[in-house]
Design a protein with these regions (language model features):
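Extracytoplasmic copper-binding redox domains, predominantly the cupredoxin/blue-copper superfamily
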Residues: 2-8, 18-105
């Protein structure tokens, strides 16, 4: 193998190794007083798009205190997951609206 090709191969290998993984975006919807999906999985660093399709204000309030997201009617709010774990959350205004989010490290 020619020295130039070795350098090119090494440079492309280093680029592939050093490129961080791209964070994902997960959509969670509040519609007709239901959270969908009711069970979701994500990773630390991922973004959650909380989409409120209802005419009511909703929250996504973690029972363990990890987050408390306020969602005005007919609006979308985003947040970034900062901590791993299984999080049960609900709407403070409509306590029957509940779901679980599992966040991997």
């Amino acid at each position: 193998m020619k020295p130039g090709w070795i350098l090119l191969f090494a440079a492309s290998l280093m680029t592939a190794i050093s490129v961080p993984a791209t964070a994902a975006t997960l959509q969670i919807t509040m519609d007709n007083l239901v959270i969908s999906p009711s069970e979701a999985s994500a990773e630390v660093g991922d973004t959650i798009e909380w989409i409120n399709k209802d005419v009511f204000v909703h929250t996504a309030t973690a029972r363990n205190g990890d987050f408390d997201i306020n969602m005005p009617a007919k609006k979308t709010v985003t947040s970034v997951l900062k901590k791993a774990g299984t999080i049960e959350y609900y709407c403070r205004f409509h306590p029957n609206m509940k779901a679980t989010l599992t966040v991997a490290p």
